[in-house]
């Protein structure tokens, strides 16, 4: 399931988002904060607007998120930096990066990787 939220024009599919109370928009997350969501589409202009952008955002379940670092084949605990995910097995929170598919190529920074948000 997804919801449509206000965002910035530079948000792309797979960006990890958090709510910014100053702008009242969902922007690229700089750290692991709760709640968080993942953009399932690129930002587009809001209907009947020339200045406001919206994005479809997933907050729970399986979704593709952008990797900020290379992701090990075994996956691991999810952490966030610069609007993207990486493995941090010292983290304790609501998400994981799933293991790589058998015989698939290595997942590198910038790739979309499957994450589970609880």
Indicate residue ranges for each PLM-predicted region:
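Surface-exposed, low-hydrophobicity beta-strand/loop segments enriched in small/polar/acidic residues
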Residues: 1-118
């Amino acid at each position: 399931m997804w919801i449509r939220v206000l965002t910035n024009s530079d948000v792309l599919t797979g960006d990890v988002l958090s709510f910014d109370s100053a702008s009242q928009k969902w922007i690229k997350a700089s750290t692991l904060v709760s709640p968080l969501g993942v953009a399932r589409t690129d930002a587009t202009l809001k209907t009947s607007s020339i200045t406001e952008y919206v994005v479809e955002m997933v907050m729970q379940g399986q979704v593709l998120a952008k990797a900020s670092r290379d992701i090990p084949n075994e996956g691991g605990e999810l952490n966030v930096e610069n609007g993207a995910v990486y493995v941090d097995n010292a983290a304790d929170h609501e998400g994981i990066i799933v293991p790589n598919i058998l015989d698939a190529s290595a997942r590198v920074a910038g790739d979309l990787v499957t994450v589970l948000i609880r």
